[in-house]
Amino acid sequence: MGMDAVFVHMVEKYYITNQCDWVDSTQLVKIADRAQKIAPNLIGREASEFLDFYGRPFMKDTLGKTHTLQEIKANYTLLVFYGPTCGHCKKEIPRIKNELDSLISTGVNIKTFAVGTEFDKAEWKKFINTKEIGDWINVSDINHDDEGNPVASSDWRDKYDIYSTPVLYLLDKDKKIIAKRISYKQITEIIGKIEGNK
């Protein structure tokens, strides 16, 4: 966790300033592109809001209501990316839910902003009901072009480095990233360390 900041620093300081002569131009473009994509969501920075290419919020719940990260008023926000048909998600989401319910029962003020990463609305709704996560803010970017093909509203997958699921980000009350790409077991551990230091 947090090694992406080292990667971005190395790219900005050495690679794109032509101090790495062993890297060919094709590879350099790939490295620089990746660093540019993940730089906005490094630990300690405010999590990127889900805005479309025109700067408008676009993540909608199952009823079509738009939601944003900033609307959440809690000491902590768990940002969860999951795929309803992902086998690993089917196992991990109930564990995440149990962990959060335990934290909430001890008085921790935490809310969940859960992003479905797939384009099948029926599967997404079924997953929410089956996994009993209806108390989370469940949103998705389910849009299709005129021919019925899935279309993303923004580059949020790149910004949040979502190439597999589930992925968890822990945010503070100001939506700054405390931790990212953590396991469900680390949620309580990290919050415990923070709460213990207050």
Task: Give residue spans per PLM region.
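Oxidative protein folding and maturation machinery
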Residues: M1-K65
